[in-house]
């Protein structure tokens, strides 16, 4: 096998591979000899089938396997001898002349083919110890705990029927049956019986609750509303619906009491324990936001410290994924690029930059993780899978089988776990300076940072444990 490099431009490489006819013949003969003792053909004793006969019967199919094995060997040889890492699967280009291929399959001519590769960039990791990051931290105020307790008390207070003939007011609860229709046809999910609706909670479609103000028990009303353009169920978005509503009861809220009895409804023994649990929960929310902010700052710092060529196809794939999200978001909201104060051309330029950032950060984090020998234990992946299954009640077995049979899907579960471990590792190398801030300041930049959630690397899948993750695809 003769391998010659014919192109080296950036991360694109091409090699010409030549398999001599004599080598093809030798490989075929070896395969046929091995087949002789295994095959059973009518009219021949086991192990006594002439090789020439085997060649007439199986020669072409075995030669196809010989060629495929040779292609795989050539790919491996190219990668090992040139110390290359693939960004994508190699592209193999066989001769266009079918007669030439036919001769090679008969071992009467050399087989020449091209191997085109897109490879990973090589770069050195920089010293991260000179990075200084500010970590904003916020404390839970007593007023926030009190407000949370008030909400919990209001959500758990009892309701009692108003006097006969009483009209429903804001804050009351109405018990209703309803049937919804679009263009005169009942639609899925548009009907319910004995549904509790707290007037003023804004939990139903905008305008629905307002049309029940003043209603009395036993009254029937027709409610007409229009589903928002961004309604999750696309088949309903923007459509007008008419609901036939029967008001079965009008109930007034009881007093919202914050005491030990409230704590017991949440499985805690006292109000003090409930306050402690609420404070812990609110603190966890603030800690998570603080983590997001410092992680964003770290990724910004890493992005500014690394500059290397990016695999064009990986960037294109990442851009396509991000752009699809952007277009779907605009469509669901009924908006255009002009509505967002930009043009499609400008937006594409910005999101292409974001795609490049994601690929770059994915590659950097992958190399950091590889150099630090960071692994994700199977137990953690299993926990992530269990959490995923809980999102599909009633379909757990179906989703479980999908993940277990789909290595790519499992890699997507593992990738963010790997990234968080790598981020923790790098945060241990940098200098962190804590800065006390208010809760409002902690969340102030949330909207900008979320842009399309594409400014971070997690969805780029940085991990050295699978090819997909390594490529940050």
From Swiss-Prot:
Xref: Pfam families: FKBP_C (PF00254), Trigger_C (PF05698), Trigger_N (PF05697)
Superkingdom in the source lineage: Bacteria
Chaperone listed as a keyword: yes
EC nos: 5.2.1.8
Compositional bias segments (type: Low complexity): 451-465
Molecular function (Gene Ontology), one example: peptidyl-prolyl cis-trans isomerase activity
Any one of the GO CC terms: cytoplasm
Free-text function comment from the UniProt entry: Involved in protein export. Acts as a chaperone by maintaining the newly synthesized protein in an open conformation. Functions as a peptidyl-prolyl cis-trans isomerase.
HAMAP family: Trigger_factor_Tig
Family: Belongs to the FKBP-type PPIase family. Tig subfamily.
Domains (record comment): Consists of 3 domains; the N-terminus binds the ribosome, the middle domain has PPIase activity, while the C-terminus has intrinsic chaperone activity on its own.
Protein name: Trigger factor
Encoding gene per record: tig
